[in-house]
């Protein structure tokens, strides 16, 4: 939400975040290839796919808000998100049974569940995009980007913030950013209620 009221600066920051996350995704895939049996790199891989699908939905929601049509890209990253969600839930069960440090199976479960719920959301939204108001798309954009930021920050703190207590490394980003997601989502929801009920196609 940096310079949210200044679209030009907001786009610059948004594009920087988008390409930075693409680098993170590529590096996490490389890490998993090198260390396929490492719970840490498995978690980073799952998070990176979640972030990839998130930033794609976040960016595409702006285009859809402006009247663009739903394309195969929407369904492609929705399918990828669903596969990743099922995989993360499976890894959660595996690491619970294996006795891995408790934070890993918990977060696999949390982010896996988020992925599955997002698949349901995508199906509802992309099946009937004409029913959404511009502010509905904006709310989807904001919540998705904040969700991607939460996931990527979690990966960063786990990887680099070893000076923090273990619970802060693994759960701190969610504890700090989730309230912001609810706050801005609530503001956009309130704006939506005040707005005219006209769908996108009539604007």
Regions found by a protein language model. Name each.
Residues 1-203:
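Alpha-helical membrane insertion/targeting regions
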């Amino acid at each position: 939400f940096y310079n949210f009221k200044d679209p030009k600066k907001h786009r610059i920051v948004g594009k920087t975040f988008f390409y930075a996350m693409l680098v993170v995704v590529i590096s996490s895939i490389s890490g998993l290839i090198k260390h396929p049996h490492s719970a840490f790199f498995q978690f980073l891989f799952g998070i990176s796919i979640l972030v990839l699908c998130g930033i794609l939905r976040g960016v595409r929601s702006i285009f859809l808000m402006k009247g663009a049509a739903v394309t195969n890209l929407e369904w492609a990253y929705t399918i990828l998100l669903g596969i990743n969600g099922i995989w993360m839930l499976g890894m959660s069960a595996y690491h619970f049974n294996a006795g891995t440090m408790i934070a890993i199976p918990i977060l696999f479960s949390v982010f896996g569940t988020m992925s599955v719920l997002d698949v349901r959301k995508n199906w509802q939204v992309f099946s009937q995009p004409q029913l959404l108001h511009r502010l509905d798309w904006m709310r989807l954009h904001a919540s998705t980007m904040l969700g991607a930021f939460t996931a990527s920050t979690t990966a960063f703190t786990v990887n680099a913030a070893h000076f923090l207590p273990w619970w802060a490394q693994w759960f701190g980003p969610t504890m700090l950013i989730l309230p912001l997601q609810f706050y801005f989502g609530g503001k956009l929801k309130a704006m939506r209620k005040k707005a005219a009920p006209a769908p996108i196609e009539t604007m």
